[in-house]
Amino acid sequence: MMTYNKKYIDSVEYDLIETRKRMWMMERKKNEELLKKYQQAMSDLEDYKNLYMRQRSEMENYQRYIEKTINNIKANANADLIKTMLPVLDSLDAGILHDEKLKPIRSQLIKILSNYGLKEIESRGKKFDPYLNEVVGIVKGDDDIVVEEVQKGYILNNEVLRTSKVIVSKGGNNEQDNRN
């Protein structure tokens, strides 16, 4: 049998231990690098996720903006068309005073226009509202009550298209102004 020198064995053990230490250090370094790469990848993933969410939110906001813009364009186009129809309604109102047979035509036209958001302002017998009514005459009577509509007013999609021209009563005053 062969006998080994104690120094030689110690030297081999030392080399083995040192080799293991180096391997362990290399693995540790490699693991640290992998951990850093993993952490960077997770950070990048989070950044991309946030970017995606922002882009998605911006796209949804843009779609809502486009829809709102299209609806406004439609509403304005309808408003322009309906405004041009108001003199026709005024003519029908004047014609009804002479011929009741025009009432169904006016009703039909109002029904069609109401499908596009037009509403008549009902003022007669109600308290004067400066947002809905324009005073064209004042008569003696209860304060601020609309006694007569000289010209109908209209609301389109909750916005005043044309104010009603009205005669309003004022308490204790004689007829002061009556412009027709």
From Swiss-Prot:
Instruction: Name the keywords, alphabetized.
Output: Chaperone, Cytoplasm, Stress response
InterPro entries, sorted: GrpE, GrpE_coiled_coil, GrpE_head
Q: Name one GO cellular component term.
A: cytoplasm
Q: Is the keyword DNA damage assigned to this protein?
A: no
List, in alphabetical order, the Gene Ontology terms for molecular function in this entry: adenyl-nucleotide exchange factor activity; protein homodimerization activity; protein-folding chaperone binding; unfolded protein binding
Q: Write out the annotated subcellular location.
A: Cytoplasm
Keyword Transit peptide in the entry? The reply is no
* GO terms (BP aspect): protein folding
By its UniProt entry, which Pfam families does this protein fall under? GrpE
The record describes its quaternary structure and partners as: Homodimer.
The UniProt entry's sequence similarity note says: Belongs to the GrpE family.
HAMAP family per UniProt: GrpE
- Function text: Participates actively in the response to hyperosmotic and heat shock by preventing the aggregation of stress-denatured proteins, in association with DnaK and GrpE. It is the nucleotide exchange factor for DnaK and may function as a thermosensor. Unfolded proteins bind initially to DnaJ; upon interaction with the DnaJ-bound protein, DnaK hydrolyzes its bound ATP, resulting in the formation of a stable complex. GrpE releases ADP from DnaK; ATP binding to DnaK triggers the release of the substrate protein, thus completing the reaction cycle.
Q: What is this protein called?
A: Protein GrpE
Which gene name does the record give? grpE
